[in-house]
Amino acid sequence: IDALEAEHTGLSVVPDARSRPRQRLATYLLELLADEWLIVAACWERWFFSEDGRAPSHRAFNEQQWGAIFGVGQSGLARRAAGARFFEDAFGISQARSNPRGPFAGLIQLGCTDATEPAWRDSLHRVLQALERHFDTHDYVLGGRPSLGDFGLLGPLYAHFYRDPVPGFALRVFFPLVCEWVERTNGEGCLGARRYGQKLYSVAADGSLEGRCGTSDEGDWLAEDAVPETLMPVLRTFFEEMWPFLKASIEALQRYVESAEHTRGEELPRKTFTATPGFEALQTGEGALTVPFEIGGVRARRMVVPYQIWMLARLAEAIRDCDRERLAPWLAQFPNGEEILELEARLEGVRVRKVGGRLFSA
């Protein structure tokens, strides 16, 4: 998105720092929440229903999807068989409950265990309920025009929920307005989706066709830098659940890069849903790159993901030119919300450099 924004400057999906600071910050917070927090419950939904003996099961669907990669050019059933072989060889899927590997081990490392799984699902459902109410009034996150926040949310909600048969069915049954938004934001055909830029027509008094904007809020973000009240419960999830974990992650990563175990400039664990090979001892158990966290009143432990620290630095840079006096009162409604304004200082001792898909301390 950053690359596309730089190349196509006509109509931005990122609100301007000076004229729309609250909306700008809100979109970056939503991107981070969706990409790195909602994804935990999304991965659970993806893999739980692929385990042996689960009912309902979307194992065959997942095998077919992965088989498209590992069985290119083969017949349909041969592709599915290729996906099934990969699941067994790489993930040991038939023994996922007794000897978790691959994404099944990754869920534990991300803090989604038998003890915390209900809390993760409850958190996800609260977010979906809030979004269902929000999309009753607004077609996109900030009104009638898509933003970075929409595309951030689209990642897990489209790929892991909407497309997968089991969670996708539940999404359609319980959150149909969220489904409409998925189709609208992804540019798919849907009678009620009202895509951005679409016009609706009616017959005027003189018999001519009269066009009007097809999306809510006159096809634009809300005026005067307003963030919809219906979006507040979603943003509150960031501050109540994710932000305490991120603060602990910053401190843990700083201790590690300043320790004798690491030399500045060396490689760090990558963005992944499992502990990075070579860093397993650090990112599992009581390793130096694990921290305690809490979700839904349940305390547990999970791995630190340096990519999230890189994303926080990106957020800090994005709001550097924003008017703090306009942001502070808005942030005050969230638990410890104003701490975001001191993000650059908090990250001073733990900078992360990204080179392609690799991460290094800086």
Language-model regions, residue ranges each:
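All-alpha helical catalytic cores of prenyl diphosphate-utilizing isoprenoid enzymes
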Residues: 83-103, 114-131, 151
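GST superfamily/GST-like fold recognition
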Residues: 103, 141-161
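Short His-centered aromatic/hydrophobic patch
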Residues: 134, 156-191
